[in-house]
Regions:
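Bacterial N-terminal signal peptides that target proteins for export
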Residues: 1-8
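C-terminal motif of bacterial Sec signal peptides marking the signal peptidase cleavage site
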Residues: 13-17
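Bacterial lipoprotein signal-peptidase II cleavage site
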Residues: 19-26
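Short structural boundary motif marking the start of a folded domain
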Residues: 26-32
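Structural motif
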Residues: 32-40
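A short, structured loop/turn motif at beta-sheet edges
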Residues: 38-39, 72-79, 112-115
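Tryptophan-paired
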Residues: 45-91
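Beta-strand-rich cores of mature extracytoplasmic or soluble domains
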Residues: 84-158
Length: 158
């Protein structure tokens, strides 16, 4: 009888664990995607500790890395810590400062959103500026709320 009672208690505990849910609308997962608007090569980047891979100069948006959690509702002051390493993206640049990766870190505000999207688009801009756009669209989409996809300058040879 004790065994049966113990079995029933375990089964009830498991059922209770399976049925418990997070409150609706608490948070969403989004894939990370980088857009590099600079001539630097981005070796790696992280948003609140979630790794996002690398990005070539004036490139990005082609791959996604899972996942970062974001609140269902945007609020003033919502931000994330972005860390990344860069070096020169110009082939053959042998200057010590060009070949030694440099770490950068910034607390970056997340652009306002009405509906949380499935993509956290991380835009690396000139002068070590970063913009975070949570959207269901890529930067190439017509009504994308952030910066357009990076464009290589006409004199960029690589």
């Amino acid at each position: 009888m004790k065994r049966f009672a113990l079995l029933v208690l375990c089964a009830l505990a498991l059922l209770g664990a399976c049925s418990s849910k997070k409150p609706a609308g608490e948070s969403y997962s989004a894939n990370l995607s980088a857009y590099n608007h600079t001539e630097d090569y981005i070796h790696q980047f992280y948003v609140d500790g979630a790794g996002g891979g690398n990005s070539r100069p004036y490139g990005g948006g082609g791959s996604f890395v899972c996942c970062i959690s974001s609140p269902a509702q945007w609020r003033p002051g919502l931000s994330a810590t972005v860390k990344w390493t860069t070096s020169s993206g110009i082939p053959g640049d042998k200057r010590p400062e060009a070949i030694t990766p440099r770490w950068h870190e910034k607390v970056v505000p997340i652009d306002r959103y009405d509906v949380p999207g499935g993509l956290m688009n991380v835009h690396f801009l000139p002068n070590n500026e970063v913009r975070l756009v949570l959207s269901n669209m890529r930067a190439s989409a017509k009504n994308y709320p952030g910066p357009a996809s990076p464009v290589k300058p006409p004199d960029w040879k690589w």
